Amino acid sequence: MSYTKTQAKAGYQAGVKDYRLTYYTPDYTPKDTDVLAAFRVTPQPGVPIEEAGAAVAAESSTGTWTTVWTDGLTELDRYKGRCYDIEPVPGEDNQWICYIAYPLDLFEEGSVTNVLTSLVGNVFGFKALRALRLEDIRFPIALVKTYQGPPHGIVVERDKINKYGRPLLGCTIKPKLGLSAKNYGRAVYECLRGGLDFTKDDENINSQPFMRWRDRFLFVQDAIVKSQAETGEIKGHYLNCTAGTCEEMMERAEFAKELKTPIIMHDYLTGGFTANTTLAKWCRRNGILLHIHRAMHAVIDRQKNHGIHFRVLAKCLRLSGGDHIHTGTVVGKLEGERASTMGFVDLLREEHVERDLSRGIYFTQDWASMPGVMAVASGGIHVWHMPALLDIFGDDAVLQFGGGTLGHPWGNAPGATANRVALEACVKARNEGRDLMREAGDIIREAARWSPELAAACELWKEIKFEYEAVDKL
């Protein structure tokens, strides 16, 4: 009898069996319809890696700690997860990548919540494992097609706001907490009239005593209308609809719709995938863009031996739904290597991405024509970073300068103008064939000669750098 199969006909025998007898199947060839997962496994001393990998496959699918008589009431060989390959992690002791295949029928259609409940559930507390990290998931086309995905996507967003050929510019309003609704709206107006495309609620802003959500929405929409009238451009502000209950979240979204705002916002990890998918479907029905913030992600993804890599959270967001998501900047104050960051940025934006371990992509992923998500670069960036940001992210991104706009010595509007001039100069230089990375300083200095706003920003931030080594490196 093959130990890689569960044979009910062999008869029920109580007791505890090694997981590897049933769930380690190195001869298995994954099917096109399987959900594939790559786990970084660190077993406890004395636990063979084959047993550890099989335990992950078992505990995240059909297994439990002992043999149960109800195993004989179903065809476990059809439903079990299979650890089909194990590779050592280069440069690391006692760490392996275990590849596990899950049958499609284990997962509810259109539910990111259900996928994560299985794959990153109780197995992460398993005593036989010292640490466990989900590095990547391959979602088969058969499952991808059960999700709506982004409410609109990159192409439709550009058509809605009538802006092409460059990244979009944004700004998070600061201070993040404490402003009254009227002063908050004034800050939004100054940024938008100065040249930004979007402004943003900080993720912390919901409906606090100093600024209730309804008041904020009203003053912000007034700022949008005024700035559009002055500039002739379509403007927007990410109104954060995240709330304590789904009912309150939807009430805020409905009010934003009444105001005819073009875009709203949700904190998808703290708010939860069920709430996020609900909001994304509503946004498509109502023609409103959805900006996604990733507050809480570093708690989950920053440690390289335990947790969930952000590329998994990014893929799950594309399925759940969002038109923008924060991805880090590579050059700013937040964690992120270039190769790894661009790996998950491509997974957000492209229709088809090939396996590429040099960028942390463990599986080829086909999105079956699902719309792409705009990457948002935000966190500790200023005008001197503009050439690098354009070189790294290209056009389909939102470059979001909070302190890099509001910290301008002349105020918000000049800060916005400085960023817009720097961006337009970099786009022009790129289109002329200049090397953005090699000529970065020259490009910015040339533009600053005829823009006093940019010159002042360049002088203020000329010494500001964030040169720390990334914690989570490939």
Curated annotation (Swiss-Prot):
The record marks K333 as: Transition state stabilizer. It is an enzyme of class 4 (lyase). Its main location: other. GO terms for cellular component: carboxysome. The active site is at K174, H293. The modification N6-carboxylysine is found at K200. Its EC number is 4.1.1.39. GO terms for molecular function: magnesium ion binding; monooxygenase activity; ribulose-bisphosphate carboxylase activity. Mg(2+) binds at K200, D202, E203. It is found in: Carboxysome. Heterohexadecamer of 8 large chains and 8 small chains; disulfide-linked. The disulfide link is formed within the large subunit homodimers. RuBisCO catalyzes two reactions: the carboxylation of D-ribulose 1,5-bisphosphate, the primary event in carbon dioxide fixation, as well as the oxidative fragmentation of the pentose substrate in the photorespiration process. Both reactions occur simultaneously and in competition at the same active site. Belongs to the RuBisCO large chain family. Type I subfamily. This is Ribulose bisphosphate carboxylase large chain. The lineage of its organism: Bacteria, Bacillati, Cyanobacteriota, Cyanophyceae, Gloeobacterales. The gene is cbbL.
